[in-house]
């Protein structure tokens, strides 16, 4: 079994290599791969992960276990949903949410947002960011400078 310290070191190394250059150059701290630390400091109210069941990278499973340690002692709330993959019905998707206590409402709001019919829009992107804990100025910048 890998120690928590060794795993954290491997995880930090993976973070540096996984973040896209575009995200690293944003003028604010991007939450991606920093969710747990931000949540434990009270700076992020909600984390959301989605993967195909059975195809989760080991690094993700290990990261979720780190969250689950805090769920076990009441620092975080966890909700998991498994649904048919929208584009490949034989596959299943896991939607995994972690929220700070008192912010469980964000999970329900995020599920409503993700299940809204119609094309993804700037308004939906903004609400997505707000639910995850990004500030208005950060969402403004993202919407102005994102591509694709």
Residue ranges and their predicted role:
Residues 118-120:
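Short, 15-30-residue, compositionally biased linear elements
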Residues 132-133:
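Activity-critical C-terminal alpha-helical subdomain
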């Amino acid at each position: 079994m890998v120690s928590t310290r060794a795993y954290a070191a491997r995880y930090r190394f993976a973070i540096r290599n996984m973040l896209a250059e575009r995200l690293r150059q944003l003028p604010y701290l991007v939450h991606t791969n920093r969710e747990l630390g931000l949540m434990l400091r009270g700076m992020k109210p909600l984390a959301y992960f989605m993967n195909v069941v059975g195809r989760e990278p080991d690094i993700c499973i290990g990261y979720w276990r780190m969250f689950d340690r805090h769920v076990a002692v009441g620092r975080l709330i966890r909700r998991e949903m498994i649904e048919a993959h929208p584009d490949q019905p034989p596959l299943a998707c896991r939607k995994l949410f972690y929220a700070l206590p008192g912010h469980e409402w964000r999970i329900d709001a995020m599920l409503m947002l993700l299940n809204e019919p119609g094309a993804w829009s700037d308004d939906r992107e903004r609400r997505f960011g707000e639910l995850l804990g990004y500030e208005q100025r950060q969402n403004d910048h993202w919407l102005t400078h994102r591509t694709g």
